[in-house]
Design a protein with these regions (language model features):
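Proline-rich low-complexity regions
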Residues: 62, 69, 137, 195, ...
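Iron-sulfur cluster-binding cysteine motifs and their immediate structural context
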Residues: 197, 203-230
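Charge-patterned, long linear interaction tracts outside catalytic cores
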Residues: 181-203
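FMN-binding flavodoxin-like domain, especially the glycine-rich phosphate-binding loop
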Residues: 2-6, 10-40, 47-188
Length: 230
């Protein structure tokens, strides 16, 4: 391995923190360089990213409803190509369950020319509320992640043949996305939410905002009242 790449979609910064921590730790253990590629914003999802056989990619996304975010899945499927590249799929979740998110990401990476050698599902503070998994990852979580990265680095450095896909929890195949049902048992119909904010709040962070999730984290004083989803 000559380089480690941290690749991630991170609307609020949680996944970025986890993926870069793991990637940097692996790079330190292998004595190689580390680089990051953030495909959160649309302008970073326009060109094919190729990775070579001497690189290791730590690839992360959050889990939405137990899956890789459906709006990001096409980018994961088409924009990142490995050439026998080692990979570590990582998903973050808001303290309920990562369900099929990790195995789905593993399968997409394997399909795109990567060889997965380790995988992680990591609890992070929920994007909708600081009261759900507050402060996670905490100090103990980071210790566990550092140990995980050390073991991934050791495995990467000792491989003598192409590894089988890493075994992770989940259904394979993963099946269709979850469909919320209404009280009548039929698929629920959702209207687009338009947050009510103080003048200028969202405009002041529009270059940082990835939809409502990032807005919540950057503008809590203005858009988190009881009317923000009216």
């Amino acid at each position: 391995i000559t380089a480690v790449k941290a690749v991630y979609y991170s609307a609020t910064g949680n996944t970025e923190a986890v993926v870069t921590r793991i990637a940097k730790r692996i790079a330190e253990r292998l004595g190689v360089s580390v680089e990051s590629y953030d495909f959160t914003l649309p302008e970073n999802r326009t060109q094919l990213q190729n990775f070579g056989p001497s690189e290791l990619v730590v690839f992360g996304t959050p889990v939405y409803a137990g899956r890789v975010p459906n709006k990001m899945l096409p980018a994961v499927q088409t924009l990142f190509k490995g050439d026998g590249t080692l990979a570590v799929p990582v998903v973050t979740f808001g303290n309920r369950n990562f369900d099929n998110g990790l195995i789905e990401l593993r399968n997409e990476l394997e399909h795109n020319g990567f060889h997965t050698i380790a995988g992680a599902g990591v609890v992070c503070s929920h994007v909708f509320s600081d009261q759900i998994a507050p402060g996670r990852p905490d100090e103990e979580d980071w210790k566990i992640l550092d140990d995980f990265a050390d073991r991934a680095a050791e495995k990467a450095g000792s491989l003598t043949e192409i590894p089988a896909p890493i075994q992770v929890r989940g259904d394979d195949p993963v099946g269709p996305y979850y469909t919320p049902l209404g009280t009548d048992g039929k698929p629920a119909v959702f209207l687009k939410a338009k947050p009510l904010t103080k003048d200028g709040c969202l405009r002041s962070v529009r270059n940082l905002c990835q939809g409502l999730s990032h807005g919540l984290h950057k503008c809590r004083g203005s858009i988190t009242g009881h009317r923000y989803l009216h």
